[in-house]
Amino acid sequence: MSGLTLRQLGFENGPLDEFSLPSDLVVSTAVDQPNVVTIVLAGPSPQTVEDHLRATLPNEGFTIDARADAGEALTFEGNGWTGGFTGTGATSAIVLRPV
């Protein structure tokens, strides 16, 4: 499953080469700070983003800690960062924080 890394998306903070998102993403809002990286997506669907994360995070050095039984939500950590993903309707968000 191919995607774009944070570096390819123009971010200066976060696990720049170790974290990716679907290549057809539509960024609605983004925060790029040393202490937090937040990305709100208007597309693709939250299910597509979650599927991408579940398929790529382990290969990128992350461990998925928890996943919601209902709906799109998960937490993960690795490469010196913790992260969370949630989605509802057509919108989803990722938050990354350094450990």
What are the functions of these language-model segments?
Residues 26, 46-48, 69, 81-83, ...:
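Generic "edge-of-domain/loop-turn" microfeature
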Residues 36-44:
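Second-shell loop/turn segments in exported
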Residues 73-90, 94-98:
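Short, exposed beta-strand-loop hairpins at the edges of beta-sheets
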Residues 44-65:
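Amphipathic alpha-helical segments
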Residues 7, 11-18, 65, 82, ...:
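Intrinsically disordered, low-complexity, compositionally biased regions/tails
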Residues 29-36, 65-71, 86-90:
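Short, ordered beta-strand-loop transition motifs
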Residues 1-37:
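Compositionally biased P/S/T/G-rich terminal and signal peptide-adjacent segments
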Residues 58-82:
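Short Gly/Thr-rich strand-loop-strand
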